[in-house]
Every structure is written in structure tokens, then in C-alpha cells.
């Protein structure tokens, strides 16, 4: 079961790496919602790596599974919001948002601006693969991570109660 968490960590690292590739090589600038999703991928990936390395017992597993579910849910909510904004651009407000000002003011944005500085347009849906935009794919991936952690948690809970 530990290998699943290594795979989740590697998937998160690959997704973050691909986001940086799109930003630096293709010029697709991240918006505030993209940065929040990157942070969620970081949190999921680090939690999965800790789970893999630590190999916790019962209580620790519940905590790690719960954190992955929480971070996946947060990422899915943000990705869903961005997917909605792309489909309904008239609901989008132009100008610097409070989220952008908040994110760009964080020490992380000063320390690693390529990763954490938001300067893109949230309703830019130009990148597509199989007719799905980046936030659509991100929503599916966050859902998958949450479902995997939920199933593992359920399996662990059932094995304890039997």
C-alpha cells in the first residue's frame, strides 16, 4: 500500500513540473486560482511522501488520509471555480483580485516567483487536451487523489472494525 503514496507523490511532482513547463516554455502564465491549485498539489505530494517514508500505523494513517482528502477537496473546489469561470467568462471581474494581491504578497512568491507568483488570466481556457481545459483536468485529478485516499481510509477503517 505504501507504493500508492509514492505514486501520488510522483504524480504531483510531475503535474507541478508540467505546469512550470507550460509557464516557462509555452508562456501560459498562472492565475491566482492556478497558484492555489499548485499549492494543493504541493501539499498533497508532500503529505503522500511523508506517508510513504513514515509508513504510519493506524492513527497516523487516518491523519495522512484525512489530510490528502482535505487538500484534494480544496484543490477540487478551486479547480471547479476556475472551470466555471472559463465556461462563463461574463461572471469574471477584470483587474487585480484580492487573491492575486494576497498570493503575490506571500514570502513564497518572493522566494520562488516562477512557482508561486500569480500574473495570468483566470478565464484563459486556450490550453485543451481531449476538449478539457487545465482546470477540468485538475478537477479530475484532485477527485482521483481524494477518492484514492478515501478508499484507503475506508479499507483501513473496515479492517480495524472486523
From Swiss-Prot:
Lineage of origin: Bacteria, Pseudomonadati, Pseudomonadota, Betaproteobacteria, Nitrosomonadales
Protein task: Required for disulfide bond formation in some periplasmic proteins. Acts by oxidizing the DsbA protein.
Alphabetized InterPro entries for the sequence: DiS_bond_form_DsbB/BdbC, Disulphide_bond_form_DsbB, DsbB, DsbB-like_sf
Disulfide cysteine pairs (residue numbers): 31-34, 94-122
SUPFAM superfamilies reported in the protein's UniProt record: DsbB-like
GO biological process: protein folding
Membrane topology: Multi-pass membrane protein
UniProt topological domain (Periplasmic) ranges: 22-39, 81-136
GO molecular function, a single term: electron transfer activity
Name of this protein: Disulfide bond formation protein B
Parts of the chain on the Cytoplasmic side: 1-4, 57-62, 156-162
Location(s), subcellular: Cell inner membrane
Main localisation: membrane
A GO cellular component entry from the record: plasma membrane
Gene: dsbB
Keywords annotated in UniProt: Cell inner membrane, Cell membrane, Chaperone, Disulfide bond, Electron transport, Membrane, Oxidoreductase, Redox-active center, Transmembrane, Transmembrane helix, Transport
Residues passing through the membrane, by range: 5-21, 40-56, 63-80, 137-155
Native species: Nitrosomonas eutropha (strain DSM 101675 / C91 / Nm57)
